Amino acid sequence: MAAEARRPVLVVLHQEHSTPGRVGLRLAARGHPLDVRRPRFGDVLPETLDGHAGAIVFGGPMSINDPDDFLKRETDWLAVPLKENAPLLGLCLGAQMLARHLGAAVGTHADGHIEIGWFGLTATSAGEALTRWPDRVHQFHREGFGLPAGATLLAEGSAETFPNQAFSYGPAAFAIQFHIELTTAMVNRWTQRIGDRARLPGGQAAHLHFEGRALHDWKTSTFLDAFLDIWLGRDSRQGRAAAE
């Protein structure tokens, strides 16, 4: 008898032509179809995740502090996976949405610092207990988040700029500020749009993005495989296996 088809993963994207990158490729390799939705362009998010293995909310150039209605709707919608204890992952903007939903502040650095390029990362003891984390990661953000009450900090950046880099909340929700989804093609597109931001505090020129990728991206790739298995394995709804 053929194995039961695996449940799809809900993928929330914020630009018309954006993709889930290698996160999507790794999920597809595990047999999970991708249910891609773009609420910014009118797609409706589901009222339940009962038919999904989990949900991933990706990043985008907008700010959670922008007045657009779709940002508030998405942030409010996070109550659905949180209530159901469905696996939930927020990446970059998605991480900031989760932090905001849980009551934490999200905003720019007081001295105008940004993180665009490769920066150091240190796992906390809780993070080390979860898996092995990369020690340098690819960042592309101008805002950071506070640690929500009841959340567990998993990874830290610089104490002077953006110290909170990853956290977990409850049994199955995770937020990661840095980018684990980037393919080389995505880096090429993104670095073409850096412009004057490379001259801001914490901005790096395009060639440094590729140098960092050549030196350090293998660690993020290894982390991604391990983390996805852990994340999918957190699905305890009705005792079912997350991989179904």
Predicted segments with their positions:
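Pocket-forming structural segment of enzyme catalytic cores
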Residues: L102-A185
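Cysteine-nucleophile active-site neighborhood
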Residues: H52-A53, V57-A126
